[in-house]
């Protein structure tokens, strides 16, 4: 047993190191022009199991999956089992602004979570997952005729990359068989690079590069509770709530501007701004959920989340606030999520597809930033299935998220995407004493 725990923890350490290295290699963890603002696009929390139901999970209790969206949900498990969840995500997007169109594809490891029993109705979990992603690469040309008349044509190339990850350690316990509580310690870390290259068609002018190199870290706590009430037969009602505290970021933002001509580099500006005294922070978040469940046959749930970013400082801090002429205003983000799951007959020994779990969901999200006073909203529909594999609760989860971010109104960029998520759910029975020697 001890060796298994050591191997599992060693695997988690290697994965964390691997993620840290890949984050420094410049590969896109996600790609969207909206990630130019602040810390980029905030990743939707949850495994492939949650994402295939619109992202629900605050009131979900399912002993076959690790539901890390609510720390209290870790107690919904077999008391003798070791559990692991590993997820991958493929995103395919098409962008449109006016008559312009483009597209991009990305592939990324999304989450790795382990869970162990502690004592009777208590359990422990540890994992790593992206918190936000930056990935963009676009060009524009100068349109001001006065500037063009003086200097000639100018091309602006902007690109950025980077990720902020969260490592979390949590535990939960159930009391009176109905009321569960949980708490999580979360540590954030990551690097973000943003660069704009200004190139003059007239070679008598020097090219100018402006950019920021951001390195951040911080810690916070998250708390959750769930209350489950039996109604009639196998039907039960579950109420859930979560709260994540605001996070003061530490680290630095290196902001620079230099001009080049031939092999000559002239530094115009170079400053290092230390993040301190809470001038840049992640917003706090509160979430509530309500779910109805019919044993292991069906589950339906509605979740609402709200996060306050208005005082985050993202829209004023150097390196976070803008690239070129792009500006944004930090605001309150919201998310509405509805999802369901149905399993025809989990114990059917004749028809395999009746043992599979089928899921669907919808969501509506409002981003943590406004552009020129306009909200940036996303909406989508999700589908998914879990295919049972081998014995116990092992399974392969497949999910699809079809959605749209923003619209072409107000000269904004419309993003339509299809995201495919894959989750590997692994169970193993530990701590069970052999009946025979």
Q: For each predicted feature, which ranges?
A:
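Bacterial N-terminal signal peptides that target proteins for export
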Residues: 1-10
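Short hydrophobic "helix-edge" motifs at membrane interfaces and signal-peptide entry regions
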Residues: 10, 59-61, 167
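Bacterial N-terminal signal peptides
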Residues: 10-18
